């Protein structure tokens, strides 16, 4: 009986000793592997070069600041630049190779061939319906027209800011705007917008909810309409939905990879919605030349200074989805 107990104890002790030996052996092996691995890394580290990925901090500035006409050493090897211009520019220039000429001139400012894209649009109204800004930097040229001044302001407000939009079902619901950043944006071939403010009993204030003819008309046959009403008040809307789409939008902040270049006009467009604040002139500038060749030459000269007032963004603007922050 005692022999069996002694044997059991002895077996247990031997097992503990063997386990301890095995663990120590494994520890030595792991230490050897780890130290050898670290040694190899230390030896190879000076021979390796890794890509450093950093945060692209926004660069802001005012286009009213006087800029120096200069060629800078900074080369935008990984950036793309889009120039949006009215078709009348190409018609006036009347040169099949004018884009190649400008590409060579942009090369002297550090923009490689193939990094600058030229996109035309028919007029402000058609561009308003489907503005698609996909480049790292986007310069939109608008020729000033006194009869289209308000349309130009609305388009500038749309493309110079980021908007988060949601669908509106005006047949079922009343809507109200919560603050100054909340707007209703309508797009289409013809947008006529009428509103009827409601009191707490959902009765029309100065209008009849059952008669759209009594509604206040805030936009008539527009292709782009940004509607601003009294905040905190419910409204019933009437929209030409067969030719227009309306969305409830929130202005998130500036879209800093877009700049507007106004061609001609006595004053720079002011897109400030709140009349109590200073005019918003950032990323907006004016070029006063009669000929489009001179306009493009000026843009080439100052392109790097203009870009410095912008910030490269990965998000694009695609109005087809009507979701402006993509």
From Swiss-Prot:
Compartments in which it is found: Virion; Host endoplasmic reticulum lumen
The keyword Electron transport is assigned to this record: no
PTM (free text): N-glycosylated.
Single GO MF descriptor: metal ion binding
Signal peptide: 1-50
Tagged with keyword Protease: no
Binding site for Ca(2+) 1: 95, 206, 214, 216
Major site of localization recorded for this protein: virion
Binding locations of Ca(2+) 2: 177, 228-229, 231, 301
Annotated region (GPR motif), positions in chain: 253-255
Disulfide partners: 82-135, 165-249, 191-244, 196-207
Positions of glycan attachment: 69
Keyword tags: Calcium, Capsid protein, Disulfide bond, Glycoprotein, Host endoplasmic reticulum, Host-virus interaction, Metal-binding, Outer capsid protein, Signal, T=13 icosahedral capsid protein, Virion
Domain of life: Viruses
InterPro entries, per database record: VP7 (IPR001963), VP7_1 (IPR042207), VP7_2 (IPR042210)
GO cellular component, one term: viral outer capsid
Record's function text: Calcium-binding protein that interacts with rotavirus cell receptors once the initial attachment by VP4 has been achieved. Rotavirus attachment and entry into the host cell probably involves multiple sequential contacts between the outer capsid proteins VP4 and VP7, and the cell receptors. Following entry into the host cell, low intracellular or intravesicular Ca(2+) concentration probably causes the calcium-stabilized VP7 trimers to dissociate from the virion. This step is probably necessary for the membrane-disrupting entry step and the release of VP4, which is locked onto the virion by VP7.
Note: Some rotavirus strains are neuraminidase-sensitive and require sialic acid to attach to the cell surface. Some rotavirus strains are integrin-dependent. Some rotavirus strains depend on ganglioside for their entry into the host cell. Hsp70 also seems to be involved in the entry of some strains. In group A rotaviruses, VP7 defines the G serotype.
Quaternary state and interactors: Homotrimer; disulfide-linked. 2 Ca(2+) ions bound at each subunit interface in the trimer hold the trimer together. Interacts with the intermediate capsid protein VP6. Interacts with the outer capsid protein VP5*.
Protein name listed in UniProt: Outer capsid glycoprotein VP7
Organism: Rotavirus A (isolate RVA/Pig/Australia/CRW-8/1987/G3P9[7]) (RV-A)
Lineage, opening ranks: Viruses, Riboviria, Orthornavirae, Duplornaviricota, Resentoviricetes
């Amino acid at each position: 009986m005692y022999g069996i107990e002694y044997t059991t104890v002895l077996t247990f002790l031997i097992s503990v000793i063997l386990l301890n030996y095995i663990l120590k052996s494994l520890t030595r092996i792991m230490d050897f592997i780890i130290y050898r691995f670290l040694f190899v890394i230390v030896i190879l580290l000076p021979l390796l070069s890794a890509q450093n990925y950093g945060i692209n901090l926004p660069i802001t500035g005012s286009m009213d600041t006087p800029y120096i006409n200069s060629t800078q050493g900074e080369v935008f090897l990984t950036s793309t630049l889009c120039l949006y211009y009215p078709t009348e520019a190409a018609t006036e220039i009347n040169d099949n190779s004018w884009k190649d000429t400008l590409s060579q001139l942009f090369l002297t400012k550090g923009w490689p061939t193939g990094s600058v894209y030229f996109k035309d649009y028919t007029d402000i109204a058609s561009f308003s319906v489907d503005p698609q800004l996909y480049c790292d930097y986007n310069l939109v040229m608008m020729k000033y027209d006194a009869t289209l001044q308000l349309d130009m302001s609305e388009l500038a407000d749309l493309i110079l800011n980021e908007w988060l939009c949601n669908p509106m079902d005006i047949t079922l619901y009343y809507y109200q705007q919560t603050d100054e950043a909340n707007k209703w944006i309508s797009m289409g071939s013809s947008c006529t917008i009428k509103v009827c403010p409601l009191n707490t009993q959902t009765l029309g204030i100065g209008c009849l909810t059952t008669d759209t003819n009594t509604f206040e008309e805030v936009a008539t046959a527009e292709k782009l309409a940004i509607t601003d009403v009294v905040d905190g008040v419910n409204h019933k809307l009437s929209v030409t939905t067969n030719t227009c789409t309306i969305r409830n939008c929130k202005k998130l902040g500036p879209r800093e990879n877009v700049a507007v270049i106004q061609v001609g006009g006595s004053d720079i467009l002011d897109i400030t919605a709140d009349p109590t604040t200073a005019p918003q002139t950032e990323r907006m500038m004016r070029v006063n030349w009669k000929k489009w060749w001179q306009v493009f030459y000026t843009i080439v000269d100052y392109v790097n200074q203009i870009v410095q007032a912008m910030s490269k963004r990965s998000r694009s603007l695609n109005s087809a989805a009507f979701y402006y922050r993509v």
